[in-house]
UniProtKB/Swiss-Prot annotation:
A GO CC annotation given for this chain: small ribosomal subunit
One Pfam family of this chain: S4
Family listed: Belongs to the universal ribosomal protein uS4 family.
Name used for this protein in its record: Small ribosomal subunit protein uS4
Taxonomy of the source species: Bacteria, Pseudomonadati, Chlorobiota, Chlorobiia, Chlorobiales
Keywords: Ribonucleoprotein, Ribosomal protein, RNA-binding, rRNA-binding
PANTHER family in the record: 30S 40S RIBOSOMAL PROTEIN, SMALL RIBOSOMAL SUBUNIT PROTEIN US4M
CDD domains noted in UniProt: S4
Length: 203
C-alpha cells in the first residue's frame, strides 16, 4: 500500500500536533505552521477547514491514506453505537498500532515496518498485514528468528510502564503482548476530535 513519504515534521507543524517522536522537538522550537508567514497567520478558520484538519490528524497519526480511512468510517457507521467512538476503536485495533502501543517500536511507522516485514505473529501465526484488526485475547509475539532485535529491545527498554495502556498486557522478557480488551474512547489520549471527522463525512 502507498504511504506518505513527505516531511512528517512539516505536517506536524501545520497541524499543530507531533505525529512522530522526532517531530516533538521541532514543535517545541517552532510551534507554528511552516512557511514564510507561518508565525503571522491569523484569521478565523472555517468549519470545513477545522473538520479537514482533524481528519488529517487522524490519518497521519495512524498512517492511513484516504481510501482506507474512508473505509474505516463506513465500518464505523455500520456498527452499533457512536460512530466517532467506533472509528477510533477500529483504528486502535490495527496490528501496527498495538505493536506501537505495546512499546515494541517508538513510532507507528516503525511498528508498521515490523509487521509488514513478517516479524510478528498473532496467536502463533505470522501476520504481515499492518491493518489486521486484533481482537480481545489475541496474543502478539515476535517470531523466534526475529526475537531480540536491537530496535525492538531498545524500544522496550526506553518505554516506561506508564506509557503502556491498560488494555494491553506486555511481557517484555518474551517480547509478547496480549490485547485484553477494546479500549473505551475516554481511555485513548490522542489530540484529535473525531466528531468533526464524522460531520465532514456526513455531508
Amino acid at each position: 500500500m502507498a504511504r506518505f513519504r513527505g516531511s512528517i515534521t512539516k505536517v506536524s507543524r501545520r497541524l499543530g500536533i507531533a505525529l512522530a517522536p522526532k517531530a516533538e522537538k521541532y514543535l517545541e522550537r517552532r510551534p507554528f505552521p511552516p512557511g514564510q508567514h507561518g508565525q503571522g497567520r491569523k484569521g478565523k478558520i472555517s468549519e470545513y477547514a477545522l473538520q479537514l484538519r482533524e481528519k488529517q490528524k487522524m490519518k497521519y497519526l495512524y498512517g492511513i491514506l484516504e481510501k482506507q480511512f474512508r473505509n474505516y468510517y463506513k465500518k464505523a457507521v455500520a456498527q452499533r453505537g457512536v460512530t466517532g467512538d467506533n472509528l477510533v476503536k477500529l483504528l486502535e485495533r490495527r496490528l501496527d498500532n498495538i505493536v506501537f502501543r505495546a512499546g515494541f517500536s517508538p513510532s507507528r511507522a516503525g511498528a508498521r515496518q515490523l509487521v509488514s516485514h513478517g516479524h510478528v505473529t498473532v496467536n502463533g501465526k505470522k501476520v504481515d498485514i499492518p491493518s489486521y484488526l486484533v481482537s480481545p485475547a489475541d496474543v502478539m509475539e515476535f517470531r523466534q528468528k526475529s526475537k531480540n532485535m536491537s530496535a525492538v529491545t531498545d524500544s522496550l527498554n526506553k518505554t516506561p510502564e506508564s506509557r503502556i495502556p491498560a488494555w494491553i498486557q506486555v511481557d517484555k522478557a518474551h517480547q509478547k503482548a496480549v490485547f485484553l480488551s477494546v479500549p473505551e474512547r475516554a481511555d485513548i489520549q490522542e489530540e484529535f476530535n473525531e466528531q468533526l471527522v464524522v460531520e465532514l463525512y456526513s455531508k
